[in-house]
């Protein structure tokens, strides 16, 4: 009888420990721009996570006003759209999953009138997943000549300090 109770207790503790491992879910997120400049943010969690996703927006990737989410979504929806009329200032987004797990994203491609393929190389994790290239720190692009007025403003807003032409 005592052996049965010990076995039951051991089995219960083992099962409960497995269910509440506390392991953070892997969060994969991407930010895209639609044809009119709105931001579409998509995400997946592994393992599957239920609850609420809060979306915060900022002009910089490291400073978000956590008292004012701009949007809410059910985590299971897997997407939210941020509507903007500002196609000059670049936006970054902080996704908060149940106020416990966080992921910062931005649109990788920067919309320009006369520059092809200007991309933010931030947001990539190291091989072991413990370090990430900072958003808004390194960009790649095609030629930067003959910029339109809006492109000049957009580049100024990116606060690029050094341009290296590798051609």
Can you name each region flagged by the protein language model?
Residues 1-5:
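Positively charged n-region of N-terminal signal peptides that target proteins for export
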Residues 6-15:
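Sec-dependent N-terminal signal peptides
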Residues 19-167:
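Cys-dependent protein tyrosine phosphatase-like superfamily
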């Amino acid at each position: 009888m005592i052996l049965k109770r010990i076995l039951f207790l051991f089995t219960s503790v083992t099962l409960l420990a497995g269910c509440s491992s506390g392991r953070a879910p892997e969060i994969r997120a991407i930010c895209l721009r639609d044809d009119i400049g709105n931001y579409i943010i998509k995400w997946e969690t592994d393992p599957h996570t239920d609850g609420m996703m809060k979306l915060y927006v900022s002009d910089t990737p490291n400073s978000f006003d956590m008292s004012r989410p701009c949007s809410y979504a059910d985590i299971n929806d897997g997407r939210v759209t941020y509507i903007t009329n500002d196609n000059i200032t670049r936006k970054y987004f902080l996704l908060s999953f149940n106020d416990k797990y966080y992921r910062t994203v931005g649109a990788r491609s920067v919309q320009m009138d006369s520059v092809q393929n200007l991309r933010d190389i931030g947001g990539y994790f190291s091989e072991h997943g413990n370090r990430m290239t900072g958003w808004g720190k390194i960009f790649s692009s095609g030629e930067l000549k003959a910029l339109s007025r809006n492109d000049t403003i957009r580049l100024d807003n990116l606060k690029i300090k050094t341009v290296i032409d590798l051609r």
